[in-house]
Amino acid sequence: MSIPETQKGVIFYESHGKLEYKDIPVPKPKANELLINVKYSGVCHTDLHAWHGDWPLPVKLPLVGGHEGAGVVVGMGENVKGWKIGDYAGIKWLNGSCMACEYCELGNESNCPHADLSGYTHDGSFQQYATADAVQAAHIPQGTDLAQVAPILCAGITVYKALKSANLMAGHWVAISGAAGGLGSLAVQYAKAMGYRVLGIDGGEGKEELFRSIGGEVFIDFTKEKDIVGAVLKATDGGAHGVINVSVSEAAIEASTRYVRANGTTVLVGMPAGAKCCSDVFNQVVKSISIVGSYVGNRADTREALDFFARGLVKSPIKVVGLSTLPEIYEKMEKGQIVGRYVVDTSK
């Protein structure tokens, strides 16, 4: 298979610097890596943080962002096993880990101190060819719609793992804060498929319509409802059994600690820059509330999340645009105007 020397990609050279759509070199895979011809990539709010450089974790510069890449294996290093040319493969946030530390041995690879992160410490999927550690790359079934599956590789895996972390049972109420965004819209569908009743919180044009179209039961528009806590308590007859916080709002996180049910769990997923998690200690102790963080997912979570997708239980509400339009997508993200998930076609 002929592999070009150069390719189109979006790169920036300094934090919040110009996003340049230009010709860049095609990377060479290391001994343990795949070279993937990326066809489509989802665009995640984390990509915006990587560009802004506003998280406490240092970003590689210059950087090609992106960590929801779906494509075809076109090359591999000499030590790679279990893959062949032509396989469908996914590039995840966790590009690689050491597989030898205590975290990796327990299946918590995302907590590996040597983790390599796509679109953050490792050039990601906003280019036509990208590399990924063969152990962590996602196996995608042949014939899968690569545009549709791209958001599952981060957003889907992340919310699926978060729902597992909430320790819910069928029939329980789960509140999803940020329910109509890229992560939230998938969380609604995974929650429904897992047998939960879904309450969504979001605000803005078209968001309630999207929420209801994917099976959500109760929607609360924070731009219209002044008492979010009271509204959730009333709708769920005492509070949500679990909360999945995917919004990037510190106030939303604090509110979730007040509308979660006694003995319930609020799961933190979204990471607003510089935000703190504030919970009234008396309320937390007396109600026996758990507050936990959930950070992407491991290889088993990946396999399970992709299985839900393959069986038609979840579908990404996507809008496909050209990779060259990435700066415009970031602008929409900064203004909170994203409904569903944008996916970029690397050929445009």
From Swiss-Prot:
Binding site for Zn(2+) 2: 98, 101, 104, 112
Predominant location category: cytoplasm
Gene Ontology terms: biological process: amino acid catabolic process to alcohol via Ehrlich pathway; glycolytic fermentation to ethanol
Compartments it resides in: Cytoplasm
Keyword Ribonucleoprotein applies: no
PROSITE patterns recorded: ADH_ZINC
SUPFAM superfamilies: GroES-like, NAD(P)-binding Rossmann-fold domains
UniProt keyword list: Acetylation, Cytoplasm, Isopeptide bond, Metal-binding, NAD, Oxidoreductase, Phosphoprotein, Ubl conjugation, Zinc
Induction or repression: Expressed in the presence of glucose.
Protein's recorded name: Alcohol dehydrogenase 1
Organism: Saccharomyces cerevisiae (strain ATCC 204508 / S288c) (Baker's yeast)
